[in-house]
Amino acid sequence: MTWPSEARPNINMEYRLHTVKVYVMMEDKQWKNVGTGQISSKYSEQLQGVCLLVHSLSDGSPIMECKIHPNVPYQKQQGKIIIWSEAKNHGMAIHFQEPNDCQEIWEDICQIQGKDPHVEITQELTDDLETFEHMPLIWNWVEMSNCEIHTLKNIAELFPFVFEMPSQKERLALFLENEGYIKKLLQLFHTCEKLKNMEGLYYLHNIIKGILFLNNTRLFNIMFSDEFFMDIVGCLEYDPALDQPKQYREFLTQNSKFKEVIPIIHSQLRQKIQQTYRMQYVHDIMLPTPSIFQTNLLSDITTMIFFNKINIITMIQEDENFLLEVFSQLKDNSIGDERRIELLLFLKEFCEFAKTLQSQKKNELLKTLIKLGIMSVLKVVVHMNDYQIQVGALDIFAYLVEYSPCLVRAYAMEEAQDSEDNDDLLINIMIKQMICDFDPEFSQGIIMTAVLHELLNPENMRTTAKGCERKVFLNFFYKRYMRKLIAPILSIRVKYDSNDNRVYICPDNYQNAQLLGAVLEILTFCVQYHSMYIKHYIFSNNLLRSILVLMSSKHTFLILCAVRFMRKIIGLKDKMYNHYIIKKNLFEPVVNAFMHNGHRYNMLNSAIIELFEFIRKENITSLIVNIVENFFRAFKSIEYVQTFKGLKTKYEEEKKRKSQRRKNLHSIMHPKMYYRHIEDMEVKVKADICCRGIIEEEERQGGGEEGAILPMGSDFTNNYDIFMKNKDTNESESAIEGQKIKSSEASECCPSHGDASATRMSRSHCSSLVPLVDYLYDTDDENDDDPYGNDKHEDEHEDEDEEPPPKRPNLST
């Protein structure tokens, strides 16, 4: 809806007075407050239009007289400010105390311009009016100078606009720093707290929080000083979003007291430690976790904390006696547990601060700590009955491994050279702490899992002057430490419940399941990153079978750990692993767990199906055959996935392929074996002919002697007939071959001399005529496995009638 602007508007000309502040934009685009007065709208004969008139509150003199132009853009902001510009770099602004007063004047302006009074801008602003976007700063900046309880609201409303203007942020930071403004605000805090003025306290919370988010190092130094810190904390207690104030000051004064474990000589070091603790407390505890859009709001405070920690570590290292005194007291058996806890907690915080150092500096620090005896101290204190000390010792050990795993590995191997007792080695002691952790949160186990991952990670192992660190340390680890690590798995016992026909493990409580899960996670890591070493260990200790026993646990997360371990092994597609799984029938516990899970569609169901699906996709033939032949009956009824039917299909395809391969091999080998028989017959017939000729010649020369064995006259003819018959047919091959062999043996070459020596000489003479026959397809090992993996017994039955004759010596003419 619009109103005609040509006609003179019908405006109520009653004398309406509203208190306002008037601002004018100067040539440098800075706003100047020209005074406070009362505003009214009335028709001016001189200006020929409706004007906005402001008269001073103090003396009634005119402060502003501006005609409402039909084509000038006016804008209303925050319900209390009206701004406009009549010329370039010339702006006007009026700030009302009450929104209703502002709305009355705004309706007059919209009526003159023919606009809807519900809009907040009458026309599009030009580039010259960009400064008006932040007009609320005008009123609030003026209120800043008047630090009073009644101005706290306007001061608090200033910060959201300042954060959008980097130039204004720096200006505000300078103002707060130079005017002693923080001190004035904290004086108001005491007043409001004494008067229990909750509204004022809420505004002060937002103001102090806004100052922190200015992210200015100079302001941080003021706010975290001894003079102001506790009052700053007090302001932050009154969060308007909470029903009750927090008790930060009570905690800091009663529970968190700064104590010098070792007297600090340097005052600068003491000041840095206190300031760092205060900043860390405010950053971590008192301020809410920033969103992804606010990650840089406190970047300067985190930077200050970072460099403060570096300075603290450096100053402590430069003090030669400080660390010496700490370790001498830790090694002293006469000190009490309370004192030992204090020293250990200091050492833990010292190591935590050292995380900020560069790698080279960390190595130097760790070498210094090892030289001072930190490892031997940890071995002693970790055996103490105080749980806080045990966790502290593990935390320190974790920091050292994180700083330089190479140095810790080197220390571990040097330590082992001087000790034959594996239980006395540092890493074994720490592993024992993990195994004996009775904390429901399993805190020590979590720490040691991360430590062992770091120590066993081959990516941070290097090649040293003494050789490859990976090979040396892993050999050492599997020899001296692995037995301790897998002890919880090997100690598991099983019991059979006849009522539900199931096997259960014991112990099977949640705490033990957590431990076993952590050990399995480490072993899975080993399978992935140093497979050769863990493979030997698995085979020699039958470790996979022991791990799969855990699939009878009542804790699903532990069963999943076991499945994940086996899945990692199968994922390697290693033939030795596959043979081991088949030989030990290790799919049985997996299938049992799957069947006991029933029709529940959960992580266990998905994990086991994924394992079998991987085998199917990768076509691991040996495993497919084992699964289908032994377990397909259990999977036959499963229809909601095609994995198991796919395994059956793969199995049938492989079986068909083997059968076809066997047929192809038979078609190639059968003719060659047949011609081999024919060649054998030819050689033997020639031998008969040779022997017959020699005998006939000897008979013509002198006749046969009594006692000589002469072949029958029909022997040659019979053998020749048999030979010719085999040329035409292959029927009754084995029987005929047997007759030939007997006939050949009977037809020995005999000389005409009757004595036995002469007979032996004739045999030798005949044998020397022909060398041994070398057949192309002969093999010396009759028990060799079929290269295609066929069943030997089945082949013997199938090829019984086609077995070739054994090799024999033969003669030729």
From Swiss-Prot:
InterPro entries: ARM-type_fold, EVH1_PP4R3, P4R3-like_central_dom, PH-like_dom_sf, PP4R3-like. Residues 730-813 are annotated as: Disordered. Residues 777-788 have a biased composition (Acidic residues). GO terms for molecular function: protein phosphatase regulator activity. GO terms for cellular component: nucleus. Gene3D superfamilies: Pleckstrin-homology domain (PH domain)/Phosphotyrosine-binding domain (PTB) (2.30.29.30). Belongs to the SMEK family. This is Protein PPP4R3C1. It comes from Mus musculus. The lineage of its organism: Eukaryota, Metazoa, Chordata, Craniata, Vertebrata. The gene is Ppp4r3c1.
